């Protein structure tokens, strides 16, 4: 076997490893599989010891949020996905706070306490469910890049 055959095999192997690593990183970081839609008596609470002390408070806020009236709004993204948000009106023609949830989160889980704070300031609220979360379409989170 010539030296250039070995070099080609090494280069092809490295290329394969590069693409395999890229795919694995994408899958672990950006891909979001089947989304769970929670029933009326179920609550989305993050896992981990750091959240245990706040569990009752998070459930309380999510219950309160579910009792508020809101208007469901949606837009269609450039790549033809339906993206949803909920508009909560506190005071007509007043300040609007637009809230976005965190990584692999949802508006209900991450922002239910924010509604209470915003309403205390007489602010209206738009809670956005970014792509691949809650009701919004998609399976890949883009950290808001494609929602601009």
Locations of regions flagged by a protein language model:
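Feature marks short, highly hydrophobic, charge-poor N-terminal signal-anchor/signal peptide-like helices
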Residues: 1-14
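Histidine-centered divalent metal-coordination motifs
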Residues: 84, 101-102, 133
